[in-house]
Amino acid sequence: MTTKVKKDRSLILIKPDGVQRSLIGEIIKRFEQKGLKISGMKMLLPTVDQCESHYNKNDEWFLRKGTGIVEDLQKEGLPVEKEAIEYGRDIIRTIVKYMTGGPVVAIIAEGHAAPAVVTQIVGGTEPVSADVGTIRGDYTIDSYYMSTIDNRAVRNLIHCSENKEEAEREIPIWFGESEVMNYSTAHERILYDVSADGHWAS
C-alpha cells in the first residue's frame, strides 16, 4: 500500500537584501537539497497593495511589537516619542517601504510539512540570534535593535510562511493558479512513490 504524504506548501519571499546580495541561487539550493519541490517561482517588484495584504496585522500584534520597541528605546536612554501601538504600526510601514523598493523572488516550496521544514532551514526571524547553519544565521547579522534605532526594516533576507494556514492565505497574494506547476521530482518518486506526471502511484 502506498503511503500518500500530503503535499503541504509554503510561501517564500527572497527579500530585496537577498536579491541585491546575489544569494538567490544559494537560498534555493538549501530548499532543494532538503527535498522540497519548487512548484512556483518568479521575480517581481511588489506593489504597496500586495505588501499591505501580505503583512496584514491586527492591533494586538502592533501593541506587542511596539511595546518591545519602547523597551529597547528606554534601555538605551533614547526618547519615546509616540504610543507603543504606533511604533508597532511603523514596523509594517518600514517593511512595505523596503519591500517595494527593489525586486523580490517569490517561491512556492512543496513537500511534506513544508512550512515547518522551510522555517527550520531559514532560521529565527532575528538574524543576530539565528542558529548557525540556517540561512539567516549564516548570511546576515542584523538585529531588531539596530533596525529600531535606524528606523528601518530588519534585513533578514527571507519571509516564509509559519504554518499551513498562513501559507494558504499568502500564496494567492503572489501567485495565480496558472503559475503553480504540477510535476514530480526524483526525490518524490524515490520517497513518496509518485508517477512522472506528479500523480500518486496506485
Which role does the model predict for each range below?
Residues M1-S202:
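Non-catalytic terminal and connector segments of soluble metabolic enzymes
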